[in-house]
Regions:
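Local beta-strand/beta-hairpin segments that build beta-sheet-rich folds
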Residues: 37, 69-70
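Phosphate-/nucleic-acid-contacting segments
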Residues: 148, 157-219
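Cyclic nucleotide-binding regulatory module and flanking cytosolic helices
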Residues: 1-33, 77, 82-86
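Short phosphate-coordinating micro-motif centered on Lys-Gly-acidic
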Residues: 36-42
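Cyclic-nucleotide recognition modules
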Residues: 71-127
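Short alpha-helix-to-loop micro-motif enriched in aromatics/charged/Gly
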Residues: 62-69
Length: 219
């Protein structure tokens, strides 16, 4: 496990007592792939410090349609699992493990108390929040101004980079959930990509054959 101290670049700005309290508030946890860790405003489990694995942060519409907001990887911090600390945040987000994930869980009460007394912790937390909202605003730009074929092409390229593989173990339904659209739309456009020689489709998998072609589509 990555030590708690390595998640905080402001660690040396904390007092010895604050360091001790933060480490004491962190509990080692493990979540297998597919685990729902946080279900919107219903719970406030605490701050998640990811030692290994991958988390997906997403939201769900009233009709049950999902859309991925961003992913978190090793050494990232998940704030929205402790949304009760963020009084200005009024929307519900879900957090699930996409891969087997080891993490530290820091209690909301302990971290909130440290934020109130430590300017370095408060400023660091605000910088993380600003970064996440920047990612969400980028997504909004994609939703408003990008065609779906552009978004799918970009998604496939990003997934290939994330997995370091041109063969993606993804269903059309999973892509639809990430992008907030219908499975039929994904299927139609993937078949178009295949006809263009950019991808090869098989059951539960997509192989990228021409990344340059996908790059052109995504622009």
């Amino acid at each position: 496990m990555i030590p708690v101290s390595e998640f905080f670049p402001i660690w040396n700005s904390l007092t010895a007592v604050q360091k001790q309290r933060l480490e004491a508030a962190a509990v080692r946890k493990y979540a297998p792939a597919g685990t729902l860790l946080h279900n919107g405003g219903e719970d406030c489990m605490g701050l998640i410090l990811i030692s290994s694995g991958q988390l997906r942060i997403y939201t769900t519409s009233d009709d049950g349609r999902e859309i991925t907001l961003y992913r978190l990887l090793e050494r990232d911090i998940c704030l929205f699992s402790a949304s009760c600390m963020l009084h200005s945040v009024q929307f519900d987000l879900q957090v699930s493990a996409e891969r087997d994930t080891e993490f530290w869980l820091v209690s909301s009460e302990a971290y909130s108390a440290l934020m109130k007394e430590s300017a370095p912790i408060a400023n660091f937390t605000n910088s993380i929040m600003a970064s996440r909202f920047t990612e969400v605003m980028w997504l909004m730009d994609q939703l408003l101004w990008k065609r779906m074929d552009q978004r799918i092409a970009k998604f496939l390229l990003d997934e290939a980079a994330l997995d370091s593989s041109d063969t993606l173990k993804l269903t059309h339904e999973a892509i639809a959930n990430h992008l907030g659209t219908a499975r039929e739309v994904i299927t139609r456009l993937l078949k178009y990509f295949q006809s263009e020689g950019a991808v090869k489709l098989s059951r539960g998998a997509i192989e990228i054959l021409d990344a340059e072609r996908l790059e052109l589509i995504s622009e």
